[in-house]
Amino acid sequence: MASLSKNKIKYIHSLELKKIRKEERVFLAEGPKLVGDLLGHFPCRFLAATSSWLQKHPDIDASELVEVSQEDLSRASLLKTPQQVLAIFEQPQYTLDPEAVRQSLCLALDDVQDPGNLGTIIRLADWFGIEHIICSQNTVDVYNPKTIQATMGGIARVKVHYTSLPDFIRSLGDTPVFGTFLDGKNMYEQPLSANGLIVMGNEGNGIGKEVATLINRKLYIPNYPAGQETSESLNVAIATAVICAEFRRQAAWK
């Protein structure tokens, strides 16, 4: 059994920083379920695990593989409750094609800031069969360790892109672009298409003005009962779940 050097632990901890992740083009994942989901989807540069985990997974393909004690793993881990394995994976390179949005249902995020929200939205996209999420340049980094953990493995199947949202939406032509607004139409009373882009906004400010002007289908998630005083808004991840569920419900009945 090897022990992790101080330099290796320092390197693992440095992956909390976007600058280092970007330079190295890697990301960190922890825990048996998450690491197990990602192995086979992304090249693994480094994996450290306890002997009990390695015995259950004898055929790991990693550039560097180290058996470590639980104590060592605890020192390296970024989690409050360290688990049996952590791994460093290479970031994938994806090409963003507007045709994907014309042909299927995709999500767009306008400056979502919370890593947990982004991770949960990726997990939701995975559940609802949405393959692409297009993020504004100021949206939180998908490879933030907190985001990766919150995806629960969804990052293996959902492609996340960063671009200028206004420019991308303009490239879609007359493709349906949906967004939620207080003055939008009740989404339960509107026919929703099986293709197009659903735009979700920033936690505090909603969808930005420039992007809002480009949305051609304004929706509203009604509270119940109508007109009753309620909380100001839904969390962006919860709102995404409600909207995606209605899109898929309507698609199932067509």
Where are these regions (language model features)?
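Boundary-proximal intrinsically disordered activation/regulatory segments immediately upstream
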Residues: 1-54, 139-140
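Short acidic-hydrophobic, aromatic-tinged amphipathic segments that line or gate anion-handling sites
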Residues: 1-3, 29, 66-69, 158-167
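Amphipathic alpha-helical repeat scaffolds
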Residues: 31, 113-121, 231-239
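Glycine/small-residue-rich loop that forms an oxyanion/phosphate-binding "nest" at active or ligand-binding sites
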Residues: 65-90
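Short beta->alpha connector loops at strand-helix junctions that form conserved
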Residues: 68-71, 110, 136-137, 159, ...
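RNA substrate-binding interface of SAM-dependent RNA methyltransferases
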Residues: 98-184
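Structured adenosyl-cofactor binding patch, chiefly the S-adenosyl-L-methionine
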Residues: 127-128, 142-154, 209, 213-254
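Active-site/ligand-binding-proximal alpha/beta "capping" segment
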Residues: 179-231
